[in-house]
Structure formats: structure tokens, C-alpha cells
Amino acid sequence: MLIGIAYLALFLAAGLLLARWAVPDGSPAVAVPLGCGFGVSLLAALPAGFALVCGFTLRAVWLAAAGAALLCAVLIFAGRGHIRFARDPDRGAMWLCLLPVLAVTLYLLHTHVLHKVNGTLHTGQSCYGDMPMHLGFIEYIAQSGQFPPRDPLLAGAHRCGYPFLCETVSSVFRLLGAGRRAAYLLPMVPAFVSVYGMFWQL
């Protein structure tokens, strides 16, 4: 779990630096949500890119981490003297709105998603059959190491036609030793920050 959190932090740092480079005059209200979006996108793309060469394995996961660290180093070197953010034009109004909504979201994720009850997983998330499908893809990618993955719903007889990059993010955390629930929830937190923050920018 701690390794997964550190891994996520590395990619979020890369995303934040990338956002700082993309919007050099942006305030934290712009850079943090954009950086979270970039970070989660990198977390989907980099391990998948290496997995095309060496399968979806720990080797691909650590090569992706090296790529993210290299990106951080390049962006820090390229942006020397320009790390400071601009002041928030709305003087923190976004954070006053976003943080309570994020707190409620985190509470609901903690209390309603994937709890063990008598050895089985229970959830209050209203997604019906969608969650078991996603969990199946996540587990299959992590366990099989095949990439691009086969479709586990069709006994692996066909390549997966579902847009599976969203599943690889959680599969990375499964390979790093996170439990099923932690792997499912970890990438949701920065994704929610990104979505809520970008809605504010609209």
C-alpha cells in the first residue's frame, strides 16, 4: 500500500510539473487539477507503453516509474527559476468550494465502496454490474501479464475491445501489492480533484 502511494505521488509530481510547464502563468487553482489529470494520464500511459514490450509486469511498472522520474528531472531543469505559482485570481474561492465537496466524496468512497463482509465484498456504489466488470479486467491484467489484454469475459478467446487503459492504472497498484479495494480507490482521489477543479475553471 505504501509503495503504491509513493508510486502515485511520483506520477502526480510529474503531472504537476507538466501542468506548470503547460500553463506557466497558472495559479494553483489551475495547476493542481490539471496536474492531477496529467498525473493519472501518465499513470495509464507509461506502464502500458512499456508493457507493450515486456508484458504487464513489475518490470514494466518500474520502467514507467523511471520514465516519470526522468520527466520530473527534465521539467525541473527546464523550469529552473520558474517554479513559483501565480496568485489565485479568485483568492482561494475554488478551494473553499472544492475541499468540502472532496471531503464528502472521500467519506463516501471510504464508507460505501468495496467493504469485506463475511469474506465477500459489498459495495454501495450504484453501478450494478459495472464494478464487477472493471474489477475483473483489473485483476486479469495484473495476473495474466498479457498486454494488450485478452477479454476475460470471453475466456481470453478475443482481444479486449473495451478501452482498458483506465483499468491498467489499478492493475499497476495490484502488481505493487495493494489490496483490491486500495487499488480501485487510489487513482480515484486525484481524478476527482482534477474533475472538480476543472469544472470550477469552466
Segments and roles (model prediction):
Residues 70, 87-95, 124, 131:
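A signal for specific C-terminal beta-sheet/loop modules enriched in small/flexible residues
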Residues 88-109:
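Internal/C-terminal transmembrane anchor helices
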Residues 45-52, 93, 122-125, 197-202:
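Short alpha-helical segments and helix-capping/turn motifs at coil-helix boundaries
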Residues 104-201:
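Active-site lumenal/periplasmic loops and adjacent helix-entry segments of GT-C-fold
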Residues 1-90:
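Membrane-embedded, hydrophobic transmembrane alpha-helices
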